Amino acid sequence: MATKKRALSFSEKHQKLVDEKFRKSLNIQVMNKLERQAKNQVVQNENDEKVERQRFLRVLQNEQFELDMEEAIQKAEANKMLRDRQLEQEERLANELARLKHESLKDKKMRQQVRENSIELRELEQKLKAAYMNKERAAQIVEKDAMKYEQMKRDAEIERIMMEEHDRLLKEESAKQERRNKERAQYYLDLEKQLEDQERRKQEAYEQLLKEKLMIDEIVRKIYEEDQVERQQKLEKKNAIQKYIEEFQRAQDFWRQKKREEMEEENRKIIEFANIQEQREGERMARVHEIEEKRVQRQNLLMKQLEETLRQRDDLEQVRQELYQEEQAEIIKLKVKEEAELRLRRQREMKQDFEDQMALKELILQAAKEEEETFKKAMLAKFAEDDRIELMNAQKQRMKQLEHKRAVEKLIEERRSQFLADKQRELEELQLQQRRQGCINEIIEEERLRLLKEHAAKLLGYLPKGVFKREDDVDMLGEEFRKAYQKRDGV
């Protein structure tokens, strides 16, 4: 029993092991199957997700394409609208530019017509042209005076060069004469030295002669001592020698006197020559001073003549300018007076025309009223005559008369309205004419100020009287111009 139990237990265990292995194997299979199913499910899910994603992406792409198309259409429409607005703006701008250009051309033409027809502007232009002519004439006069002054300067320069050349030649001649005088003085000095040398040699010869004489005297004395007989002979000989010595001394004295006289004569000639040279130099310097004084006097005379000529010319030009300006001022005054009289006459005429128009209007109104009454009566009579036969009934006749009266009043009202419309149109035309005249006056004033701004500064000092109508015109041109103009006007 126990063995059986043990055997059973073993088989149970074995069976359990087998069952357990089977379960494990089954579990493994199940797990593998589940894993495969899970993998398949995952793959299926991934495929489904991929398909769904692709479908979603296609939907998104389609929606994005639709959005892009819609946005492109909106952009195209917006661009078209923008282009249309731009074209419209460009067209408006072109029209505005054309209008401005047309108005500018119209304004230019109007200004041109105003400039051509305005007496004031023409007179201002004539004054400015006259000022330019005065300026040009003054410039020509200044240029001529400058040319004459330059010619005088050139003449004075030529004269100065000639005087310098003359002075140079005189100095060279004086230097040559001084060299000759020095050479002559040196020659006389050398001659005097030679004479002194000759005198010295003669003195030495004389001393030598005296020595010989002493020797002779000594010999004579010895001879006299030795021989009395011979003494007489020696005495005679001595007398002869003494006579010879005396003759020699006389000859020497005569020669010395002659040399002294020659030297005195030579010194006198030298002194006389020096005096002559000094006198000549004094005369030359006097001539130079005289020539220089004459040149200065001539130059001063020419300068005075030039100054007098320029002064006379300036005075003449000033008188001419004053006369011209007075004539222009008188002409301008006459023109201004004529314009004032013309304006006054026009104002009177306009006033008279207005009064005449008002009187005529009253007459017309009165005549219109009378005509209306006459017309009214005539029409009433006509209507009454026309309807008298047809209207037998008094009530109908009164109604017809009222109808005729209303018709007549309507006609009268229409004629009155037409008359008032005509008068209103005439008044508007008059106001338009006044505005146009005011615009023309503004253009004339603007053109006048423009001409002054453009030309007044260039013509300062040459502007005739009457160019500036008001003090504001001068102030308009600037502080510097005003000061210069007031300074010149004060001068």
From Swiss-Prot:
Top-level taxon of the source organism: Eukaryota
GO biological process, one term: left/right axis specification
Role summary: Microtubule inner protein (MIP) part of the dynein-decorated doublet microtubules (DMTs) in cilia axoneme, which is required for motile cilia beating. May play a role in the control of meiotic division and germ cell differentiation through regulation of pairing and recombination during meiosis. Required for sperm flagella assembly. May play a role in the assembly and function of the outer dynein arm-docking complex (ODA-DC). ODA-DC mediates outer dynein arms (ODA) binding onto the axonemal doublet microtubules.
GO annotations of cellular component type: axonemal A tubule inner sheath; axonemal microtubule; axoneme; ciliary basal body; cytosol; intermediate filament; nuclear envelope; nuclear speck
Subcellular location, record wording: Nucleus; Cytoplasm, Cytoskeleton, Flagellum axoneme; Cytoplasm, Cytoskeleton, Cilium axoneme
Record note on quaternary structure: Able to form oligomers. Microtubule inner protein component of sperm flagellar doublet microtubules. Interacts with ODAD1. Interacts with BBOF1.
Name of the protein in its database record: Meiosis-specific nuclear structural protein 1
Organism: Mus musculus
Region of interest: Interaction with BBOF1: 1-314
Gene knockout outcome: MNS1-deficient mice display situs inversus and hydrocephalus. They are sterile, exhibit a sharp reduction in sperm production, and remnant spermatozoa are immotile with abnormal short tails.
Entry-annotated residues carrying Phosphotyrosine: 188
Alphabetical keyword list: Cell projection, Cilium, Coiled coil, Cytoplasm, Cytoskeleton, Flagellum, Meiosis, Nucleus, Phosphoprotein
